[in-house]
């Protein structure tokens, strides 16, 4: 595309303290969130005739860490396609050459709220269970491709008013390697698993601990382990769950084990004490959707020793979850990530920049050739035709699917923040 023609396709608009230079198909830009990794606007896409979210990555080439994170997020979003994962609709830059290349824009589905807002609502068991089911379906899809999200938290999980749920933000997601000691500083502190806090390395069910913390927060309407730092976070965990066994202690390196063993010992509380019936909604007409089953699921997710913690596959078979089980959603074909060295690769900033530029050009070429039409495929659709709609009844058949919206970036990631009001289906 020649320079003049490309320039005519874009226009610039100030959004807060930033300038967005976007394709003219995107109009009515309005800021909805910002954070360490990006600024997010809602916009109207005249080509698709729908509202979308546009995320401008903040200074993606300022250092190797930012550049690698931007590359990882873009590659994973391009290839992951599931109804419970946020759908990438477009990728573009206004710059015309690699030398000029500085800005990356990701266009995604626009959702109505993030889970931070939903947590404050009184949900019945149907909605609570169904939200968890969709969360686990999305995580299972990632895990099936060897991808651990590593940053699950309420602001990274978004919903639509029809109760469709989607998972956001792959800036910190990485491919898994059995036995690999992975980087300890990842997820927002409150949702960090013990193995992360203690620098033990981790595997896929590190995401299950985060889901357990989120479920507990939805039940209690407050953060389960609100630690101020690593040490306080660990103390918050053992004060409630109890000091772990000697078997677990022996898995720690010597210096960490010495510290942990010298802390006061706690017996912890039973899950009946931590999550009494009064915190839960009234039992559903469905005999599996009741406080005792939700509490049992919590007790299997919030296990300090990861080797004894439930897996995502096991969680999906739990009675509180499997009432929704649909093989098409749970067993969707895994994404094919062509770059198997996604995490092991190390490059200079300029090399990362060139790789990202090639990914953007590849997207543009596929769009031009009709391989991408700017619409999510059926598995990535925001609303699935024929999905059940929630009503005032508490019957198991009354809850619909869910969807997401960009959320504000946290202190460790590039998530987006929703600006919309509460879910009508959860009122």
From Swiss-Prot:
Gene Ontology terms describing biological process: positive regulation of NLRP3 inflammasome complex assembly; rhythmic process
This enzyme's EC code(s): 2.7.11.24
Pfam families, alphabetized: Pkinase
Molecular-function GO term, any one: protein serine/threonine kinase activity
TXY, short sequence motif: residues: 183-185
UniProt modified residues of type Phosphotyrosine: 185
Compositionally biased tracts (Low complexity): 387-403
Reactions that this protein is recorded to catalyse: L-seryl-[protein] + ATP = O-phospho-L-seryl-[protein] + ADP + H(+); L-threonyl-[protein] + ATP = O-phospho-L-threonyl-[protein] + ADP + H(+)
Record remark: domains: The TXY motif contains the threonine and tyrosine residues whose phosphorylation activates the MAP kinases.
Protein name: Mitogen-activated protein kinase 8A
Lineage of origin: Eukaryota, Metazoa, Chordata, Craniata, Vertebrata
Gene that specifies this protein: mapk8a
